[in-house]
Amino acid sequence: YALHQDGFAGHMLRSSTVSRYYLQCPAGDQVEDWPDDRIWSQLRHRLATDDDWSLQDGPVVEKNILEMRSWVTEPMQFGKLYLAGDAAHILTPAGAKGMNLALGDARELALGLVEHYHKADSTRLKAYSATRLAAVWRAQEFSNSLLDLLHGTGVEGLPVPFADRLRRAAIEQITGEGPRARSFADSYVG
């Protein structure tokens, strides 16, 4: 991850020859506004380091502009209709929590259905929404906090020096030692 005054840039290795990159762009931009040359120029600029590392250009195989949005449906059930995964909640990709939440929903719903149909006990099934919403809101809070940390912007989408310093102080706390770092690690991995 690179926090830069021109916006966030991310470099995620997928293999020894393939990487996924992320660039923060102004709201309202379209894919057409980002030709390959502009993408590589901004990546080189935002990911620049003080050592001998350099970005290796290659073909851009896919381009998308992602609208960062989040929502939660409460409750996650209506009568006998139970919602799980993206049908119940959408998160920003920050922190990569969507699939974990969907699997947690599916597991809890499956356990509730098994108890309902095999043991004639509907307690867990009736508690499904309340049980899962606690985890959903924890993940939403983490995802949105991480999004703000990585993409925090000020007036007209440009980082404000004060906000930038606050973000950098927060990063120092979560990458160091102590309770905030442990809490962040638990939330990021868990």
Question: Language-model features: where?
Answer:
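Conserved FAD-binding catalytic core of PHBH/FMO-like flavoproteins
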Residues: 1-64, 73
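Structural motif of enzymes handling amino- and sulfur-group chemistry
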Residues: 19, 106-110
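Short, histidine-centered active-site or binding-site loop motifs used for metal coordination
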Residues: 23-27, 87-88, 94
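C-terminal helical "tail/cap" subdomain of flavin- and related membrane-associated enzymes
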Residues: 26, 49-56, 96, 111-190
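FAD-binding beta-loop-beta segment adjacent to the flavin cofactor pocket
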Residues: 66-89
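Active-site micro-motifs of SAM-dependent methyltransferase domains
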Residues: 89-90, 135
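A conserved FAD-binding loop/helix module that cradles the flavin
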Residues: 93-103
